[in-house]
UniProtKB/Swiss-Prot annotation:
Membrane spanning stretches: none
Record text on subunit structure and interactions: Homodimer.
Function noted in UniProt: Catalyzes the conversion of L-aspartate-beta-semialdehyde (L-Asa) to L-homoserine (L-Hse), the third step in the biosynthesis of threonine and methionine from aspartate. Utilizes NADH but not NADPH as coenzyme.
Protein name: Homoserine dehydrogenase
Pfam families xrefs: Homoserine_dh, NAD_binding_3
EC number: 1.1.1.3
Organism name: Pyrococcus horikoshii (strain ATCC 700860 / DSM 12428 / JCM 9974 / NBRC 100139 / OT-3)
Amino acid sequence: MKVNISIFGFGTVGRALAEIIAEKSRIFGVELNVISITDRSGTIWGDFDLLEAKEVKESTGKLSNIGDYEVYNFSPQELVEEVKPNILVDVSSWDEAHEMYKVALGEGISVVTSNKPPIANYYDELMNLAKENNAGIFFESTVMAGTPIIGVLRENLLGENIKRIDAVVNASTTFILTKMSEGKTLDDAIEEAKSLGILEEDPSKDIDGIDAYYKAKILHWVSYGEPPEEEERLGIREVRDARNVRLVAQVSKGKISVKPRKLSSDNPLLVEGVQNAAVIRTNNLGEVILKGPGGGGRVTASGVFTDIIKATLKFPNLR
């Protein structure tokens, strides 16, 4: 059976996802068929070569430079209404993408996303809309990239009371703090992170804790089914001694906090490089510890791809 997919956003993650789909287009008896791709230059829609699209984007910077295919200038809402995919995949950084999700879910189209603000800010509305229209919304890669903390909370710990989550969920600040502990200044560490493509498009989202805040808010929604009442956010700009310091997101019922914390040398959150880690404290299991890579195109795309498979298996009507 064939599942038609629209990819919205064709940056590093989108292109890595295209590569994975090309490698594994037939899986669990399902054929994954990408029928449209959208970047800032427009939308290609129809029977095109996925890897050719990837190569054109990488070599020219614009999907619209692809050869023999018509390029459409759809609005995000028009994209959903005209293309009518079975699954809409958002791997963009568009903060207002929830409006597109609402159109898709209202049409019974499942949504897979790695985009944090729409889930953090509109979780309840989107989940209810999905339920009303027998669709799904999947967002594993919004937190810890491909390391499956969302799946663990939504599926594997359903019988547990989540007492607290402590997590290092921003790989960029971990990299920067690691470099600062080796003697680099904040500015020099930021420049090195930029040169390696580790930082977000707007570095302030990482440095000021905004990215980690969105992730903490998503973890609160998933763990407790409601928004936090208390919020605290402090970035890493004021850190002077970075030795054993990490930007830690702490989530408990009604409260989220994101701020730098000095950790003991045996703390599982004291990860290096671009690693992420989380300690989930539960009533029966005690501490559940997750560690894994927290960024990178292929790593994030892996989580997105897993969500695409989950969507096809959970909603047979897609096929």
